[in-house]
Amino acid sequence: MVSHPCTADEAKPPSEGQLARFENGKLIVPDNLIVAYFKGDGIGPEIVESAKKVLDAAVDKAYGGTRRIVWWEVTAGEEAQKECGSLLPDGTLQAFKLARVNLKGPLTTPVGGGFRSLNVTLRMVLDLYSNVRPVKWYGQPTPHCHPENIDWVIFRENTEDVYAGIEWPFDSPEAQKIRDFLKKEFGIELTPDTGIGIKPISKWRTQRHVRRAMEWAIRNGYKHVTIMHKGNIMKYTEGAFRQWAYDLILSEFRDYVVTEEEVNTKYGGKAPEGKIIVNDRIADNMLQQIITRPGEYNVIVTPNLNGDYISDEANALVGGIGMAAGLDMGDGIAVAEPVHGSAPKYAGKNVINPTAEILSGMYLLSDFVGWPEVKLLVEYAVKQAIAHKQVTYDLAREMGGVTPISTTEYTDVLVDYIRHADLKALKGQ
């Protein structure tokens, strides 16, 4: 049995690898990169092991042994509670801070008062302010008529908005104080049965988030960046989010972008070659647009609540959460995690689809670490497996007439496709 660090002092990285460093705003990545991870709850151990095997195969294929991952196992969730007396031990948090490059399995937050979401706690402690949800179609069954046009990356702000948790029940002393304050100072009278919630959105947190979205768009050659907001109604929060986003983009990324208004007024409706079109959409319209005009959007940058809505809708359009990758990023630190939960009823049955965990780790290595060949190989393998109907039960039942394979068999299929892939040809596509 692996002994995990429970306290911060016990968090000692593996001697055979090296830690990534963050210097002068840039991540410095060694060739023998330490990646900290924990398996989590429920199906977590199965899908994390699957992801590790696939990612190891992709790194080995891409770099021929000149680069490798040194895995550093820590613990969280039910296992951690038994071993360390804490669902999220200080040793795990310290390991994630040290490693900077991290992979996690899903966690279960116990039902009942006094337990905050472990995922939210992790994001807050590590200041993972951008939740990144790439949404692509790999050939899986989908309700969308033209899934080939779907290539979105949703950037959801992670720390503010109504998710900040600044709220009180209607019958609390705090809510009464706020109602009294609003009445006395502003003449706003709320009935005694009114609960109170506060929606904070700040310039600094908005702009650091938008900066990450722009960097992603530039790095991946995307043609559109869209600011999603409800600023027509919430003018001083979401309206401010829109304005601060434009201000940041036009001051720091002016050479890379052209606004939609400029395209229409200066360039006859056609963007100059090599420029990213920046526009904004009202949230309710945006939720329709990704269904009706999917090819017109790439990177979508949003406040917290809107990002929650649109990312779940978007993933439903390409086959659901079994394929839904996620990446939480801050300054020089990231944690890859699937969108789905721990699904305890499927734990240990070797039937679950590990693709979301695999893709999450793929984006961690390709877009945060800077090893883009990993993405070419993993995406190729996933597409091949789906095209040949070598899939787990969730996709097999949607395809109809397909015999599902197990989690471990699916993992082996992906590894085999990676090992036999023509990387040179993939780079030329």
Curated annotation (Swiss-Prot):
InterPro entries membership: IsoCit/isopropylmalate_DH_CS (IPR019818), Isocitrate_DH_NADP_dimer_prok (IPR004439), IsoPropMal-DH-like_dom (IPR024084)
Binding positions for Mg(2+) per the UniProt entry: 308
Q: What class of enzyme is it?
A: oxidoreductase
Q: What is its EC number?
A: 1.1.1.42
Cofactor(s) required for function per UniProt: Mg(2+); Mn(2+)
* Residues bound to D-threo-isocitrate: 117, 119, 123, 133, 156
The alphabetized UniProt keywords are: Glyoxylate bypass, Magnesium, Manganese, Metal-binding, NADP, Oxidoreductase, Tricarboxylic acid cycle
- Cofactor binding summary note: Binds 1 Mg(2+) or Mn(2+) ion per subunit.
Site (Critical for catalysis) residue list: 163, 230
The entry describes the temperature dependence as follows:
Optimum temperature is 70-80 degrees Celsius. Thermostable.
The reaction(s) catalysed by this protein are: D-threo-isocitrate + NADP(+) = 2-oxoglutarate + CO2 + NADPH
For the biological process aspect of GO, one term held by this record is:
glyoxylate cycle
Is Magnesium among the key words of this record? yes
Q: What does this protein do?
A: Catalyzes the oxidative decarboxylation of isocitrate to 2-oxoglutarate and carbon dioxide with the concomitant reduction of NADP(+).
Family listed = Belongs to the isocitrate and isopropylmalate dehydrogenases family.
Q: How does it assemble?
A: Homodimer.
The protein, known as: Isocitrate dehydrogenase [NADP]
Q: What is the lineage of its organism?
A: Archaea, Thermoproteota, Thermoprotei, Desulfurococcales, Caldococcus
